[in-house]
Structures are given as structure tokens and as C-alpha cells.
Amino acid sequence: MKRILGALLGLLSAQVCCVRGIQVEQSPPDLILQEGANSTLRCNFSDSVNNLQWFHQNPWGQLINLFYIPSGTKQNGRLSATTVATERYSLLYISSSQTTDSGVYFCAVE
């Protein structure tokens, strides 16, 4: 995992998984941002799903559930997520990134 250096913010988002025959892939695999920058993470899934969640694991190992979003758009402060179930993808948007955003981000489907 990338470490915070000065005003740089390291995000690691590479996750490829297969659950019950559903392949899940995130992009980009690695992302380094300047503090204050915006970014988008994408989660593609190979089959229709009932549930989709976005998680953040901070550098101290704490796992945080960001969004439960099987479809539509939700926002929570500087973070928002959109899931388009019919096209089998979800997006996580981080606006005005801060050093506290550093960590591992991943989506989980069911």
C-alpha cells in the first residue's frame, strides 16, 4: 500500500474477486492524488447483483462501510456513489480529497 508523503494522498483500489461465479473488478488499480483533487473509482461486475456496497479500509486497518447502494445515487459529505445495475457497474466519487481518505477502497457484491 502507498504511504502518505507530505500533501500526497495514496489510494489503493485494485481488487479482483469472484464470488458465486460473479467476477468483480475495480479500476484504476492504483491511484495517487494531490490533497484537494477529485477522483473516481469504478467497480464492474459480470452478472446482475442484489446488493452492492463500497468499503474503505484506512491505514490503521479499520473497515468502514461507505455506501449500501444496489442502484441509484447516494451522497455522504465529499463522497458519493452511483450504481447502474442494468449496465453492471458502480462508481465511487471522492471530491476534495484529504489525507484522511488514504487507504484501500473496494466494492462488494451479493
UniProtKB/Swiss-Prot annotation:
InterPro entries assigned to the protein according to its UniProt record, in alphabetical order: Ig-like_dom (IPR007110), Ig-like_dom_sf (IPR036179), Ig-like_fold (IPR013783), Ig_V-set (IPR013106), TCR_alpha_variable (IPR051896)
PROSITE patterns named among the record's database cross-references: IG_LIKE (PS50835)
Any one of the GO BP annotations: adaptive immune response
Keywords (A to Z) from UniProt: Adaptive immunity, Cell membrane, Disulfide bond, Glycoprotein, Immunity, Immunoglobulin domain, Membrane, Receptor, Signal, T cell receptor
Glycosylation sites: N38, N44
Gene Ontology CC terms: T cell receptor complex
Keyword Signal: yes
Annotated Ig-like domain residues: 22-110
Signal peptide segment: 1-21
Location within or outside the cell: Cell membrane
Broad class of the protein's primary localization: membrane
Disulfide partners: C43-C107
Domain of life: Eukaryota
SUBUNIT field: Alpha-beta TR is a heterodimer composed of an alpha and beta chain; disulfide-linked. The alpha-beta TR is associated with the transmembrane signaling CD3 coreceptor proteins to form the TR-CD3 (TcR or TCR). The assembly of alpha-beta TR heterodimers with CD3 occurs in the endoplasmic reticulum where a single alpha-beta TR heterodimer associates with one CD3D-CD3E heterodimer, one CD3G-CD3E heterodimer and one CD247 homodimer forming a stable octameric structure. CD3D-CD3E and CD3G-CD3E heterodimers preferentially associate with TR alpha and TR beta chains, respectively.
Functional description taken from the UniProt entry: V region of the variable domain of T cell receptor (TR) alpha chain that participates in the antigen recognition. Alpha-beta T cell receptors are antigen specific receptors which are essential to the immune response and are present on the cell surface of T lymphocytes. Recognize peptide-major histocompatibility (MH) (pMH) complexes that are displayed by antigen presenting cells (APC), a prerequisite for efficient T cell adaptive immunity against pathogens.
Name of the featured protein: T cell receptor alpha variable 22
Protein's organism: Homo sapiens (Human)
